[in-house]
Amino acid sequence: LELLSLQSTSDQTDYLHNSHIAANVASAVTPEQAGMWVYPYEDNEEHVIYNMVNGLLLRPYISGMVWKMSDTGMKRMQEGIALYKEIRSDVRDGVPFFPLGFGHIRDEALAYGIINGDVAYLAVFTPAADEVKIPLTFEKEIVEVSVIYPKEQLCEYSYENGVLHVKMPQKAAARLFRI
């Protein structure tokens, strides 16, 4: 990594398993060098969103047959890449945090974040659940929590007493939050 700016994190082709890698890899490789394959291979909106969230707090590599995507799928990918361009300096300069601890392959929910000064980003994955409670503890009071990917939140969430409660529209869903 001293000589090259990118390191592929895996050749894993199952996007659900990739989230387990995405939620842990910043413990071994700096997030901005951790290349995460983002390869929607189903033309399903939640599938595209999940794949994009896998890479947004790392270094997304776009792959797959994106020319076969529907307009909706392509717009979701474009939205994700545009967001990555907005937040990549925070990803580069931030410090990783793991509010649920390191994820294990059988975990029903995973969470991985980056904090940089007054802003934090949190990727929430529910590979085998549709709901998760995530304890959040920061030095400063949390004033606002919002879904930033996708722009239309497409999930329910609330933050009370140091816990972010997220209810996804289905199992195998993911969202990116700004805190």
Residue ranges and their predicted role:
Residues P40, K133-P135, Y157:
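Short conserved micro-motifs at the rims of enzyme active sites and ligand-binding pockets
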Residues A111-I114, Q153-Y159:
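Short, exposed beta-strand/loop patches in secreted or surface proteins that constitute
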Residues E156-I179:
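C-terminal beta-strand-rich structural cap/linker in extracellular carbohydrate-active enzymes
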